[in-house]
């Protein structure tokens, strides 16, 4: 449990929600016999754990990471150099691209994603021939690349500074807003509920 994790005094902790995908992993069907927590129960577990971590001196990084105040992720967040890839939060200094090595591994490149085969014999055969063993790939359009940057910035900083982001990406604010279909009027309900300001 979280109290035991805190006692071991790690520098970082990450809390991900359990992914129940029995159509991929048939063994997970066994868990359904015991019952799985609903969304409200999962949120309560997360909130309880986050509260205990905060009381123990950890600070939240983004949506699911908790670190000591002197951790490089904390420093990156304070200096707006925090980044996130599909594996979690990291510093921009350490995150240009992610290269997936091995069966089912996923690569995240500047303008594309690729996944290696799930078939071990096929993977060994193609790699032995000096070939890549990619079975799925997706090339991001320029608009999708902009959208990804806006989403990552929001996930890392909790806000969007359109002017700062436009300077960093060398595009206009109107281009960024168009890429994300940004419409301030559509956000008014969230503001009314206190979710954004």
Listing of model-derived features with the role each one plays in the protein:
Residues 187-197:
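A short, conserved structural fragment
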Residues 180, 184-188:
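Short, hydrophobic-biased segments on the C-terminal half of alpha helices
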Residues 1-176:
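C-terminal scaffold of the Radical SAM
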